[in-house]
Swiss-Prot record:
This is Cell division protein SepF. One of its GO terms (biological process) is division septum assembly. It comes from the Bacteria. Cell division protein that is part of the divisome complex and is recruited early to the Z-ring. Probably stimulates Z-ring formation, perhaps through the cross-linking of FtsZ protofilaments. Its function overlaps with FtsA. Belongs to the SepF family. HAMAP family: SepF. InterPro entries: Cell_div_SepF, Cell_div_SepF/SepF-rel, SepF-like_sf. It is found in: Cytoplasm. The gene is sepF. Homodimer. Interacts with FtsZ. Pfam families: SepF.
Length: 137
């Protein structure tokens, strides 16, 4: 409000015209959803989980090599007999222990072996009370 003394007095007494500000309703900005771009971070390598279903003891060294390279390994022993399964589990348990890794029993015939650099959280309550060293009972 530009004016002199008289305008200020009239304004004080309530006789001046008030300037109304125009209310402009703004339209909400439209959300632009583009395709997400996945970018690999430098220095971060992709973690690859390996799944094995061995048929003979000869395959166990390849499974151990995957653990040594830092990959978590799922081993399915459903198609082999109990004695061979015990030998495979014993070998992989030794490998996992030597690497400072972890073993998680998913069910009586499926195991998850994880190297030291992989953290596995949670627990399978159904199997936690069963003996660890004889998984084929």
């Amino acid at each position: 409000m530009s004016g002199g003394f008289l305008d200020k007095v009239l304004n004080f007494m309530g006789f001046s015209e008030e300037e109304e500000e125009e209310y402009v309703e703004k339209e909400p900005a439209k959300k632009v959803r583009g395709k997400a771009n996945l970018v690999a971070l430098p220095g971060m390598s992709m973690l690859k989980m390996m799944v094995f279903e061995p048929r003979s003891f000869d395959e166990v060294q390849g499974i151990a090599d995957s653990l040594k390279s830092g990959s978590p390994v799922v081993v399915n022993l459903e198609r082999i007999d109990g004695e061979l399964g015990r030998r495979i589990i014993d070998f992989l348990m030794g490998t996992t222990y030597a690497l400072g890794g972890h073993l998680h029993k998913i069910n009586p015939q499926i195991y998850l072996f994880a190297p030291q650099n992989v953290l596995i959280e949670g627990e399978m309550r159904e199997f936690r009370d069963k003996t660890f060293f004889n998984p084929f009972k």
